[in-house]
Amino acid sequence: MVALLAEHTDTNQQAGLLVRPDNHDSLSVAVTATPVVTTTGTPATPPGLELEIQNGDGVGKRAGLPPRRKIETWVKSALYADAALTIRFVDEEEGRTLNRTYRGKDYATNVLTFAYAENEEDPVTGDIVLCCPVVETEAREQRKPLEAHYAHLIVHGVLHAQGYEHEEDAEAEEMEAIETETLQALGYADPYQGDRTV
């Protein structure tokens, strides 16, 4: 485990460090500075978000879909940089087609993230696709509220859009810790308690 601490010499600035894997054998480290709360009590500016929400052809007005305001809250809670994201809810057929086409796996999965930034200087852009029937089945089987499962998978997708991965054990531990902390701050239970389906 490595602990990093960032302090800014200007007390009106908050320093930040972002460490993320670039490839299998390298890491990127970014140092940032953001204004601290001003004397008027105004917080530092949160990351900007352009959010589009789409429903695939087979979804329509499906019961249980989260409202836009909740989706936006979940996305912002996991966002560390300005972003332009699309959240798309799809049926099993579209989910399976996307998973087969882009991952070579012939089944529908709960969430797919398509991140388009080629390097860390690029703005965070991506599409997060949630397959409604799979999400609903998982929530039922895991005895989780459907809303909590959607929140978890959207947070998970937003982290992927920002470069987080879970191929290696250390990456998975880091990502799961961020997801758990984020969801608990939103008032949801630990998403990994009892099950590791993501």
From Swiss-Prot:
GO CC field: cytoplasm
Cofactor: Zn(2+)
Record-linked SUPFAM superfamilies: Metalloproteases ('zincins'), catalytic domain
Domain of life: Bacteria
GO biological process, alphabetically ordered: rRNA processing
Intracellular or extracellular location(s): Cytoplasm
Tagged with keyword Nuclease: yes
Enzyme Commission designation: 3.1.-.-
InterPro entries to which the protein is assigned, alphabetical: MetalPrtase_cat_dom_sf_prd (IPR023091), YbeY (IPR002036), YbeY_CS (IPR020549)
Example of a GO MF term: zinc ion binding
Pfam short name (any one): YbeY
Cofactor detail note: Binds 1 zinc ion.
Keyword terms, alphabetized: Cytoplasm, Endonuclease, Hydrolase, Metal-binding, Nuclease, Ribosome biogenesis, rRNA processing, Zinc
Protein name, as recorded: Endoribonuclease YbeY
Gene name for this UniProt entry: ybeY
